[in-house]
């Protein structure tokens, strides 16, 4: 139905006008936008004939500035963030925690902050949860009740989250949104293409990235 070509055309026009673009490549067919066409390509004669028919006199093959991204680091630059930057509120929503479990997660973050513990990846968070569970009685006086059952639930949710590939998303260096807002030397906006074909099979991880 031409949806891919329509999307590519819109993205090209934004790029040509100096506007960076983000594209999620769900079907794996957007990457061709980065490569210039050629008169030797299939159907090139039909394209050129159509260009003349509609009066497109400056028709020419041209590539586009593109950067490929992949949360798994397989088909593009890896995208990373830290547990600290994600924060307890968003993590709690992604793991479908109830109010009590979210409260324990908040305590874990506060405990890490008060003790200068870095929360970079899932292993860091698991370690802090273990520390909180082991010292639940002592920490409860300062932070509030820490239910070991809630800690166990959070740990199980983290394992399920990790099984979707989340471990590859959390780490350093952390992604900066400005990485998506760049132009090339000629003033054309970069087309940031996210490899989402595999990512779509892990909805929670996809939602985490967005």
Regions found by a protein language model. Name each.
Residues 1, 27:
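Conserved helicase ATPase motor motifs in RecA-like P-loop NTPase domains
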